[in-house]
Every structure is written in C-alpha cells, then in structure tokens.
Amino acid sequence: MSDWNKNLAREIAKGIIATGIEGGYDSVAKSTAYNYPSIGVSQWEGNRADELLRAIPGGEEFIGRTYIDIKASGELPMLKELLRSDAGKQAALEQLSRDCLQYVEVLQQVPTLDDTRCIIYAGMWCPTSTWVVKRFLANRYMHVDLRSLEALYKLFKDYYWIAADVGELYRAGYANRARTTYEYVAGIDLTTPYGVPAYGEAGNGR
C-alpha cells in the first residue's frame, strides 16, 4: 500500500470525524440488528466495536456487554467519557483510517475518479456502503465529470438516495449530508501536513 493511499485514507477519516456525519466520538446507541452497542465515529458494532475498546485503556470493561446491561448499570456515561478521551479519540482516528484505506482502494477502481478532493468526497460516503458508492460512480463516469467536486456534490445530492435504495424518508437527510460533505472537502487544506498536492496542481487533477 502506498503512502499516498494512507494519506488519502487519513484525510477521509478526518473528514468523517470533523463533520460528524456518522456520529461523534462518544456516540453510543443500541444496534439496529443486535442488543449490543453501536459506538463511535463510524457506529462500529460487534468485533469492530470490541477492537476499538481494546485500543483504549479501560475499554475492555465494556467488551461483550449488551447495550441494555451497560445502560441499566449506569455505566453509559462512563463509556461515553472513555470514547471521547484523548486515548479514545486517537484510537477512533486510527481505526477509521484503516477502514478508509479500503475505501480508497475500492474507489481507485472507478474510471476518472482521480482528483484528490473528489476521492475524499466519495470516500466520506463509503460508510453508507462502499460497494453502492463504487457502483453509483462507475455507472455514471461517462456522463458526469468525476474530477469536478461540484459535479460530484450535485450527483450525490440528487441521486444517491435512489441508488442506496433508502426511500423518500432519507432523501432530505442525504441531501444535507451531501452539502455538509461538500463544504468540508471544499475548505480543507491539502498541502499540509502530508504534502498532498493542492486541488488541481498535479497533472492528473490531484
């Protein structure tokens, strides 16, 4: 894996965290599918939640416990405090960056999606479904300029809710996510601290 990919992955992770589009550091909710908690900036569940907790001092206390048990015991505030501690924040960034590396590798298979900001933008949608995002873009690259952040924003705002098959109920929420993500990505400084070329300065648009 290249340093370029690692840097892109970290930028995507930082964006997901900064915007809170998947949740805050101390997000804790009852999983929709199980009785166990869904935690952190990417709503990790099961083994992924356990992985995060193991990386935080004191986190093992909560491994394998149901959401109801943690709440009934009055320990929910303690779990939240643990997740938003400095160690918790660092562990979340590292774990999310590893997840985002997979997003980058999948997105690089989409023709013409090679602009830095556009990869970051698309990557910030991948927690919804990496494969849906990939298919959504791969099916449209002939008709939409995937090297244009503005074009990508409009594409996701208007059509991604249909591709994701989430129903009309989520249409407004996805439009808000598209705007929030666009505003974040348009404003980030890509010249530091990793030396990633600024938007449009590299020969391939990166």
Predicted feature locations:
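Cell-wall polysaccharide-cleaving catalytic domain and substrate-binding groove, primarily
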Residues: 1-112, 116-119, 123-206
